[in-house]
């Protein structure tokens, strides 16, 4: 597979970007594609967001990315970055073996962690096919960007999946 394809998913907070991303990843997996990467779901406590985890797409690797309770030298907004370097190494190892890479999200928090930024740069520069959720204030010149809205979110996963399949076959 020599195709170079970049698919970016963006939109306002809470519109459904992660849901669409995970649906697209599941559809690609069901077609037999080798996929790895990571996503960063929020963690809530009593209805309030307290931080973010980082999970590999196969859910075998998981740890905290950032938390309001942790203390570290890197702080983004109210969150302290707490990611463990072992987790990053495990995710990087998985990524090196896959043909399609999924990332949720490429945003200020993820880019503030040097080792995580290194993985993101590696993926964007070296891997042939990337599907990524991108913070609404970040844009890339290469690839196709899909903007999630309340009006299109129920059909956008199919549109993105069909675009990817037609681009790589």
Swiss-Prot record:
One of the record's GO molecular function terms: ATP binding
InterPro entries found in the cross-reference section: Nuc-triphosphatase_THEP1, P-loop_NTPase
The reaction(s) this protein catalyses: a ribonucleoside 5'-triphosphate + H2O = a ribonucleoside 5'-diphosphate + phosphate + H(+)
Signal peptide location: none
Cross-referenced Pfam families: NTPase_1
Keyword field: ATP-binding, Hydrolase, Nucleotide-binding
Binding site for ATP: 11-18, 100-107
Keyword NAD set for record: no
The enzyme's E.C. designation: 3.6.1.15
Disulphide-bridged cysteine pairs: none
Keyword Magnesium: no
Family named by the database record: Belongs to the THEP1 NTPase family.
Function in brief: Has nucleotide phosphatase activity towards ATP, GTP, CTP, TTP and UTP. May hydrolyze nucleoside diphosphates with lower efficiency.
Protein name (Swiss-Prot/TrEMBL): Nucleoside-triphosphatase THEP1
């Amino acid at each position: 597979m020599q195709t170079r394809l970049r698919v970016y998913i963006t939109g306002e907070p809470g519109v459904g970007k992660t849901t669409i991303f995970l649906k697209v990843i599941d559809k690609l997996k069901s077609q037999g594609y080798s996929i790895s990467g990571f996503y960063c779901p929020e963690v809530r406590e009593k209805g309030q967001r307290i931080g973010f985890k980082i999970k590999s797409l196969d859910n075998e690797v998981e740890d905290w990315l950032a938390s309001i309770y942790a203390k570290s030298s890197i702080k983004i907004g109210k969150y302290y970055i707490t990611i463990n370097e072992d987790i990053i190494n495990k995710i990087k190892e998985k990524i090196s073996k896959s043909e399609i890479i999924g990332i949720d999200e490429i945003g200020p928090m993820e880019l503030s962690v040097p080792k995580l930024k290194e993985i993101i740069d590696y993926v964007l520069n070296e891997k042939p096919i990337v599907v990524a959720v991108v913070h609404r204030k970040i844009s890339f010149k290469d690839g196709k960007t899909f903007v999630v809205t309340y009006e299109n979110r129920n059909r956008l996963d199919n549109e993105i999946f069909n675009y990817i399949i037609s681009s790589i076959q």
